[in-house]
Amino acid sequence: CALPICARTAHFTEMVRPYWGANTRRSLVQLLTSALPFFALWYAMLRSLEVGYWLTLLLAVPAAAFLMRLFMIQHDCGHGSFFHSRAARDGVGFCIGVLTLVPYDYWRRTHAYHHAHSGNLDFRGFGDIDTLTVREYKALGRWGQIGYRAYRHPLVLFLIGPAFHFLVKHRYPWDIP
């Protein structure tokens, strides 16, 4: 694109302006079309135990998808974009947090901090994946480098890390800003 950065930014801003702010009607539709199927699947899973665990596990797949959709609504509540009312956002976010096992207020504050400082090497160590500069990496000893490389391995980043984050860190928020 040959446009200067400020012109591209202005163009982008105008392009997304219609999507700014909350639309209460649309938000309620999204909430209902996420929560009702989730609870229906939850009930069906409970009833399916009489048939067999295989059916319960099969129903768990779409239930997990609807739970993920509910987490996305919780995310939008945390960003202040789902309802105009702060009380409505916080109420819905809290209730969904009970279902997703993600404490809403803690997550909202730490996620806002993450967005404010993500990618800024002067504000590392909270809400992000630890990142070292080349100079910092080279200054580590052999075991430090091995540990850092193990930490950055996809198995750790995408399996062990999220499990630790959701099962431990959300239960013991010792590093909340």
Task: Tell where the protein language model's regions lie, with residue ranges.
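Non-catalytic, topology-defining segments of multipass membrane proteins
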Residues: A2-A64, L99-R109, H117-P177
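Short amphipathic alpha-helical segments, especially helix-boundary/capping motifs
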Residues: M15-W20, V51, M68-I73, S85-R89
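Short glycine/serine/threonine-biased micro-segments
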Residues: P62, D76, C95
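Acidic (Asp/Glu-rich) catalytic motifs at the cytosolic membrane interface
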Residues: L67-R86, W107-G119
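Post-HEXXH active-site segment of zinc metalloproteases
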Residues: H84-V98, F126-T131
